[in-house]
């Protein structure tokens, strides 16, 4: 079976090895919880959930074939308008983590995505993050409409909020 190929925003091709895996959820981050990530209760401190989800968030556009450089060249970017983290179960030092992401909604100027953090060795759900990002004109310092070509790359990846 041939490897799926998707066009990036800049026109080049990227091979996608897991495009349809896990109901369109895809891995955005992998790591390990270190002792320095833990608080006085022995589990990962909330500040690091935000850090790891943020790192994973940059992979969302990359997965759609959109590079940070291509946005910069057009004078647009994305800024976070809202972020919410729900803590489900502890994750402790020495545990491997895996974060998966999915696009949930797309609007005229914004998009929403969700990421889920799992303890990788047993697939225990540890936290979820929902985030809304707004397209931003970096010169005008104001929100901007989502370009049609970017919409065309993201829209097929949206799975909706009711899908698991």
How does the language model describe each region?
Residues 9-80, 137-164:
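Hot-dog-fold acyl-thioester-processing enzymes
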Residues 85-87, 114-117, 131-133:
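Hydrophobic/aromatic beta-strand elements that line small-molecule binding cavities or substrate pockets
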Residues 105, 119, 134-135:
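PAS-family sensory domains and close relatives that share small-molecule sensor folds
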């Amino acid at each position: 079976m041939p490897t799926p190929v998707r066009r990036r925003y800049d026109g080049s091709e990227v091979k996608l090895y897991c495009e349809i895996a896990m109901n369109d959820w895809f891995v955005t981050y992998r790591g390990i919880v270190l002792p320095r990530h833990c608080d006085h209760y022995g589990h990962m401190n909330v500040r690091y959930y935000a850090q790891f989800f943020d790192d994973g968030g940059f992979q969302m556009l990359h997965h759609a074939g959109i590079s940070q450089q291509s946005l910069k060249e057009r004078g647009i970017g994305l800024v976070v308008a809202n972020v919410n983290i729900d803590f489900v179960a502890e994750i402790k030092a020495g545990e491997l983590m895996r974060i998966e992401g999915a696009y949930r909604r797309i609007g005229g100027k914004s998009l929403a995505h969700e990421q889920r953090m799992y303890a990788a060795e047993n697939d225990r759900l540890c936290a979820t993050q929902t985030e809304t990002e707004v397209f931003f004109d970096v010169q005008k310092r104001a929100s901007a409409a989502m370009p049609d070509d970017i919409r065309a790359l993201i829209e097929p990846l949206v799975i909706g909020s009711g899908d698991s």
